Amino acid sequence: KGINTVEENREIVIYARVSTRNQKDDLKNQVEFLKTFCNSKGMIVSQCIEDFGSGLNYNRKKWNQLLNEVMENKIKTIVISNKDRFIRFGYDWFEKFCEKFHTSIIVVNNETLSPNEELVQDIISILHVFSCRLYGLRKYKKQIKEDEEIAKELQNGN
């Protein structure tokens, strides 16, 4: 009869994320890579979370569910491929947050960048997000124009 500790019941979780649903193949590859890594280390994975959304978006449903489980002391380890797959900015803060709940994060591809390289990557990420937003606004503007034209045609009886 052994003592069942809380630590034994805590889960190892794989978290994989891509920005858009068009990247499903990339997500699948990311998950397989992480599963292979965990298997090679003898880690038994309890759940595999596949998420879609920008790394700048803090309102990702599955990501927030994961953080809630961290706060409930359900998660022992989170395994991610890269820091930016977890969160684009503020990774260090979230890592410390997880540590407060005795949750570790394993970054499989933990490349160390110089401060200059990191800054360049951050700027590129920001530019990418804003260019996507501008594209989305143009698309929305085009839709409004088309809707206005349809409304005019309906008013004219066409």
Give names to the regions the model predicted.
Residues 1-158:
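Short, structured surface patches at the beginning of a domain
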